[in-house]
Amino acid sequence: MTVDSKPQLQRLAADADVDRMCRLLEEDGAFILKGLLPFDVVESFNRELDVQMAIPPPKGERLLADKYPPHFKYVPNVATTCPTFRNTVLINPVIHAICEAYFQRTGDYWLSAAFLREIESGMPAQPFHRDDATHPLMHYQPLEAPPVSLSVIFPLTEFTEENGATEVILGSHRWTEVGTPERDQAVLATMDPGDVLIVRQRVVHAGGGNRTTAGKPRRVVLAYFNSVQLTPFETYRTMPREMVESMTVLGQRMLGWRTMKPSDPNIVGINLIDDKRLENVLQLKAADSPA
């Protein structure tokens, strides 16, 4: 029996020191938080996603879903369709403690996208990549530039080697190019439902292939937080106002319903209406600030 001598993903308790988490992002590029989401939250989230999975796909072109193979199921916009996500997962205080430290050099941040992927048996592994395809400008940032994107991966079923746990190449955020890595350069992010994988911008990674024969899919929700200097991949401006006003101020900020503030020298913010704050012009209420 041989022991893998490669450095492995660090696994931290959800109440670990945030400074340590941020150091790991800079040193390794990724880490796992154990048990961040309680069982009842995972269970509720899965029930809501089951409902969305059962809805027939809408007619007409689907810009992303139509590009995926049949072993790969995709549900967009979980912030609108899943109350558990927008009212609990999206405003998790640990996630935001990490984001506030991570984005401190670029200012406010918001949700760029959150969607479900369900990977069924027979789905091959992804090629290694960075999460910069939606905003190609990120590809041209120098290594010393502050990060403007953070990937947060929520497993909602068990992640194992056999069913395609995410493969992460530690330290690859310091590479100038992705190149053609070998799979043995990566480490596996095996996880339980409720764990969370946090991945720094530029880290090279891939979803593994699902080699199971029992027909059990691997279910994951991917959430991407970006600096407010980047336009979100998904827009949430079509959400019913009643739904928006049932959310907290933080949740509304994450979905682009409030004026946000980049770093200096911007002194007024972005997402303005007629030189005024968006929420003031809309007279927007919130669950934790009804007035």
From Swiss-Prot:
Pathway: Mycotoxin biosynthesis. The active site is at Y68. It catalyses: fumitremorgin B + 2-oxoglutarate + AH2 + 2 O2 = verruculogen + succinate + A + CO2 + H2O. One of its GO terms (biological process) is verruculogen biosynthetic process. GO terms for molecular function: dioxygenase activity. Its EC number is 1.14.11.38. InterPro entries: Phytyl_CoA_dOase-like. Its cofactor is Fe cation. Keywords: Dioxygenase, Iron, Oxidoreductase, Virulence. It holds the Pfam family PhyH. Belongs to the PhyH family. Homodimer. Verruculogen synthase; part of the gene cluster that mediates the biosynthesis of fumitremorgins, indole alkaloids that carry not only intriguing chemical structures, but also interesting biological and pharmacological activities. The biosynthesis of fumitremorgin-type alkaloids begins by condensation of the two amino acids L-tryptophan and L-proline to brevianamide F, catalyzed by the non-ribosomal peptide synthetase ftmA. Brevianamide F is then prenylated by the prenyltransferase ftmPT1/ftmB in the presence of dimethylallyl diphosphate, resulting in the formation of tryprostatin B. This is Verruculogen synthase.
